[in-house]
Amino acid sequence: MLTQESEDLLKQIEKLSPDFFYFKSNSLVYRAILETVNPIDKIALVSLLTALNTNNLIRQLGRLETIMKLIENSPASNIIYEYSKVILDNYVKRLLLKSGDSLCLISCSKKQITQSVITSVASQLTIAYEILEDEGTYTLAEIFASLLVSLDTKKKISINSGIFSGFWQLDLITNGFQKSDLIIIAGRPSMGKTAFAINITRHIIKTSQYYVILFSLEMSTEQLLRRILAQECHLNSQKIQSGQLTNVEWQRIVEESKILANLNFYIDDSAEISCDIIKVKVKLLRLQGKKIKLIIIDYLQLLQESKKSENRSQELSLITRSLKILARELNLPILVLSQLNRNLESRHNKRPLLSDLRESGCISKFSHIMWSHVSKPLFNFSIKKSHMHNFNKNIYQLLDQGEAFISRQDKKTTYKIRTNSEKYLELTSNHKILTLRGWQRCDQLLCNDMITTQIGFELSRKKKYLLNCIPFSLCNFETLANINISNFQNVFDFAANPIPNFIANNIIVHNSIEQDADLVIMLYRESYYNKEMEMEDMTEIIVAKHRNGPLGTFQLKFDANLANFLNV
């Protein structure tokens, strides 16, 4: 069958692996077929026999007659789909049997069962699940056909594929939370991040049939339920906790509890959890028929990384990347709450910037920063609103825009990177550099990486502290020559706004974890810092990043007693 000419045959070959075959002889023949398959013509029998003979596989299979017998008894190619389905089905069954054996061994073992052991077994089940999913590589014709059908359906019934938050101004900007998007809700403590997420959750589970799961790494399930009941019953959560309730209030709680109990909402309050465990738990729920449509994680900084890194900053970078990959794999939005860098507390203007969403990456105090066509070292830098050079990746140009905020940090180990043209920069391991491979941390740079630099400015030994340069608009790429440990020294944290990157020693640097996010929403309440404000209950919602749409700012009313946000 596999040596007959068929377009369907070539499509099915992409879905099958040699490991799917039970008999070794079939696996060896199929592996040889994969090596000789021609996407234009049918699989040539002569080429197949030559490949088997070259790899000394004919002897392993027994004799040439065995192969000829397989060919003679092969059915027509028009039923290739049914045969491939049988092969896949039997392979999945063997995987399930293997998982069952593993469970039996674990159950009979005297060793303590750990979460990692359970995760390992669950991973075997998810592999079986993924094999049955119809995923692959598609042509543009197939993609456009699917897209046009989807758009036509939306046009006819006037629906949006996004998941709406219930805050009309936010939904107007975002058009709903989209599938495969990583959404970060950020703010300093006491801004109401968890309350905001609960508001969104309540709206979704009450107005749709969507399943939502919330991974709470900070609050227990009981604490979260008290908050939800407080919002639903319009009662202070502290009053619910104390139990000092009137008969009317108690009856209200009972009625709302009955309604909430029937909604499609799951809470997981595991203290330590990683992206891998989240993936397994969501896929197991899907296997049970629970079509999870939204994942909420409270909050980012408490997530664990399966592969331990040298420092927490590197772990967070890996976690956000893993979350984005998970959102794409599960084809759903993931909403993650995140703390902002505490350095903004030292600024006069406490309104958060996109660059505050990071673990601090620092650079040497001797680094020269480009500012209004002038370069100054950090230790001689005076902050003022002026033009600072940023890199705009959309037009691939260096522009004069933005302002900066600097804070002095403790001593840290720095590394010196140097290009072939002798450009250099001293920075901590978690600071990011723009390369042809995208933004890369210092500890992830490779020799011969192409580093993005600016054109038109060179450090001058004669003008050490103040260097004039000509205006520039283009950037250049230079080869990374070496990276060495430099010194244990005082460093500075440098934040840029509105684009979270800047130019130091001619090299474009960046230290934000927001690069993996599709949507970044920041919460800010001026009255938290200014107690004399009249509108003390107003919270500013800042859409600071929107990969697929506009930015925007609007206000919501915050009820501190109920920890509840309201449209205005």
UniProtKB/Swiss-Prot annotation:
PROSITE patterns assigned to the protein according to its UniProt record, in alphabetical order: INTEIN_C_TER, INTEIN_N_TER, SF4_HELICASE
Annotated ATP binding sites: G187, R188, P189, S190, M191, G192, K193, T194
Keyword match Mitochondrion: no
Example of a GO MF term: ATP hydrolysis activity
Cellular component terms per the entry's GO annotation: chloroplast; cytosol
SUPFAM superfamilies found in the cross-reference section: Hedgehog/intein (Hint) domain, N-terminal domain of DnaB helicase, P-loop containing nucleoside triphosphate hydrolases
SMART domains given in the database record: HintC, HintN
Catalytic activity: Couples ATP hydrolysis with the unwinding of duplex DNA at the replication fork by translocating in the 5'-3' direction. This creates two antiparallel DNA single strands (ssDNA). The leading ssDNA polymer is the template for DNA polymerase III holoenzyme which synthesizes a continuous strand; ATP + H2O = ADP + phosphate + H(+)
Keywords associated with the record: ATP-binding, Autocatalytic cleavage, Chloroplast, DNA replication, DNA-binding, Helicase, Hydrolase, Isomerase, Nucleotide-binding, Plastid, Primosome, Protein splicing, Repeat
Subcellular locations according to the entry: Plastid, Chloroplast
GO BP terms, alphabetized: DNA replication, synthesis of primer; intein-mediated protein splicing
EC number: 5.6.2.3, 3.1.-.-
One Pfam family recorded for the sequence: DnaB
Post-translational modification note: This protein undergoes a protein self splicing that involves a post-translational excision of the intervening region (intein) followed by peptide ligation.
Domain called SF4 helicase: residue spans: 156-424, 308-568
Similarity comment text for this entry: Belongs to the helicase family. DnaB subfamily.
UniProt function note: A replicative DNA helicase, it participates in initiation and elongation during chromosome replication. Travels ahead of the DNA replisome, separating dsDNA into templates for DNA synthesis. A processive ATP-dependent 5'-3' DNA helicase it has DNA-dependent ATPase activity.
PANTHER family, alphabetized: REPLICATIVE DNA HELICASE, REPLICATIVE DNA HELICASE DNAB
Subunit structure, interactors included: Homohexamer.
Protein's recorded name: Probable replicative DNA helicase
Source organism of this protein record: Porphyra purpurea
